[in-house]
Amino acid sequence: TTMKKTILLIALAITSTISYGQSTFDKLEDMDGVMSVVISKDAFKILSKFNFESENEGNEMTEVFKMIENLNEFKTFSTKIPEIATQMESMVKKAVRVQKLTELMRLKEDNSKVWIYVKTTSNKDLVSEVLMLVKGIDKQTNGMSEALIVSLRGAIDINKMSSLVDTFTKNN
């Protein structure tokens, strides 16, 4: 019976950690003043079936579609309400602590701040989660957004992502 109790406690601990991670930002979906976009694993599977290989070999869209076939979930939440933006920041800080995310980088320009966190894996080129918080961006978005959370989960190849970001940055 001691063994059963131990196994039950471990199972509960793992389950609560997993469900905490999944529901951390879900409550934002139901809040007034929050815009959300959620894309599921099934949607990524469908999107990855589109074939852009032939004449588009090597272009950005091909690389994007190769990358998304390993994604499980994409969520983004934004608000223009400062009080909700503060709540969102607290939620991200708690998620970072509970899920043991590693800070990848942070950036501050004027009143805007960006934090990017990742969940590392044993493979140094892959992360299982990318979490980004952008706060104080109302001036850049003409009042359309005060804060933004982006959560991406799956097998995320940091090298491919970096390469894509470089490509899009150079093209724009």
Walk through the language-model features, giving the residues of each.
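Surface-exposed, polar helix/loop patches in the mature regions of secreted/periplasmic/lumenal proteins
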Residues: 86-146
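Structured segments of extracytoplasmic/periplasmic soluble domains
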Residues: 67-74, 94-98, 167, 171
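Early exported N-terminus immediately downstream of N-terminal targeting peptides
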Residues: 24-83, 91
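A mature extracytoplasmic/lumenal domain signature
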Residues: 41-43, 80, 120-122, 134-138, ...
